[in-house]
Curated annotation (Swiss-Prot):
It comes from Prochlorococcus marinus (strain MIT 9303). One of its GO terms (cellular component) is plasma membrane-derived thylakoid membrane. The gene is ndhH. Belongs to the complex I 49 kDa subunit family. NDH-1 shuttles electrons from an unknown electron donor, via FMN and iron-sulfur (Fe-S) centers, to quinones in the respiratory and/or the photosynthetic chain. The immediate electron acceptor for the enzyme in this species is believed to be plastoquinone. Couples the redox reaction to proton translocation, and thus conserves the redox energy in a proton gradient. Cyanobacterial NDH-1 also plays a role in inorganic carbon-concentration. One of its GO terms (molecular function) is oxidoreductase activity, acting on NAD(P)H, quinone or similar compound as acceptor. Its EC number is 7.1.1.-. This is NAD(P)H-quinone oxidoreductase subunit H. It is a peripheral membrane protein.
Length: 394
């Protein structure tokens, strides 16, 4: 080994793959000069399960339950993207009501994702108390999912080509609005505890700073990109689903450090609440119980039996064939841009199914921003990126 400026030999330390701060089975081979990080080599692949090859040997309907095992904090986002790709390739329309239901589920998942990021991140930097608070709110989201889909964290299997698996249960939208009313003050509570806490701010301000051009050149996305001064959100850029119907703002900051990434995610939860409240009020047909009452009262000629009031355009047969052609479709998850490149050959299984995971791209900048940092800051910087290794390794 070559000698360093301190006239000592560099020390190589392994973090993980079995370490509570690794957020999964991630291994970091870190070279240290005393307390300073000289080099860092992430070692991934411990959780590789061949998801793309599984997708290429399953029909579009069969693969939906698999995807929530990739990023188990963002199962709804992956369900959405794997049905969006065949929909676009086959030109299948989605009813307005189904699109609203999808948006509600996606925004609930965004909040759950950020909460699952917030608790462990704060625990990494020494704030243990909020770690227990976030599980209280996440349980309420899981209760809503359980009522609508039958499952809680993963294996919701709710999204379908052309819509969703079933309409919302009676009283569900009211419960969702109750959650919004409950959760808004809780965000204020988090901020009161954390945001201007001088110990917390001194711990993470200025850490892992990424400039605007760096973020673009490293192909970052999501809060990692928006915290570096780039207000890029695919919900605004690509106009998918019905996000254009709602009044909301893109959360972004300029500093590019761990603290900026924290503030972006806090603000995103507030914006998700705005979208949820509007979606619950504006959903075509209103609550399911009201919609069914209107249909029964007015009969088959009721306008509420029209296309935009359905929860699915047409139930796709198990023998649904993906048309010839190829496309790339993407959406904004809690971690950033997730996408699917789909190549069909007029068969029930895709010829090629390539998955783009946001956290894999975001993780690649880690060695770059760790150089020169202190060994105690490794966990704070890694935690601010928000990685789930099931999604990174696939």
């Amino acid at each position: 080994m070559s000698q360093l400026e301190t006239r000592t030999e560099p020390m190589v330390v392994n973090f993980g793959p079995h370490h509570p701060s690794m957020h999964g089975v991630l291994r970091l081979v870190v070279t240290l000069d005393g307390e300073d990080v000289v080099d860092c080599e992430p070692v991934i692949g411990y959780l590789h399960r061949g998801m793309e090859k599984i997708a290429e040997n399953r029909t579009s309907v069969m693969f939906v339950p698999y995807v929530s095992r990739m990023d188990y904090a963002a199962g709804m986002f992956y369900e959405a993207i794997v049905v969006n790709a065949p929909e676009r390739l086959a030109n299948i329309s989605v009813p307005k009501r189904a699109s609203y239901i999808r948006v509600v589920m996606l925004e609930l998942n965004r909040i759950a994702n950020h909460l699952l990021w917030l608790g462990p991140f704060l625990a990494d930097v020494g704030a243990q108390t909020p770690f227990f608070y976030i599980f209280r709110e996440r349980e309420m989201i899981y209760d809503l999912w359980e009522a609508a889909t039958g499952q809680r964290l993963i294996n919701n299997n709710y999204f379908r080509i052309g819509g969703v698996a079933c309409d919302l249960p009676w009283g569900w939208l009211e419960k969702c609005q109750d959650f919004c009313d409950w959760f808004g003050p809780k965000i204020d509570e988090y901020e009161k505890l954390i945001t201007n806490n001088p110990i917390f701010r001194r711990r993470i301000e200025g850490l892992g700073a990424i400039g605007r051009d760096e973020a673009i050149n490293w192909s970052l996305s999501g809060p990692m990109l928006r915290a570096s001064g780039v207000p890029w959100d695919l919900r605004k850029v690509d106009h998918y689903e019905c996000y254009d119907d709602f009044d909301w703002d893109v959360a972004w900051e300029k500093e590019g450090d761990c603290y900026a990434r924290y503030r972006v995610r806090i603000e995103e939860m507030r914006q998700s609440l705005k979208i949820l409240r509007q979606a619950c009020e504006m959903i075509p047909g209103g609550p399911t119980e009201n919609l069914e009452a209107q249909r029964m009262a007015e009969g088959k000629k009721s306008p509420f039996t029209g296309f935009d009031y359905q929860y699915v355009s047409k139930k796709v047969a198990p023998t649904f064939k993906i048309p010839n052609g190829e496309l790339y479709t993407r959406l904004e998850s809690g971690k950033g841009e997730i996408g699917v490149f789909l190549q069909g050959n007029n068969d029930v299984t895709p010829w090629r199914f390539k998955i783009r995971a946001a956290d894999l791209n975001n993780l690649q900048i880690l060695p770059h921003i760790l150089k020169g940092a202190k060994v105690a800051d490794i966990m704070a910087i890694l935690g601010s990126i928000d990685v789930i290794m099931g999604s990174v390794d696939r």
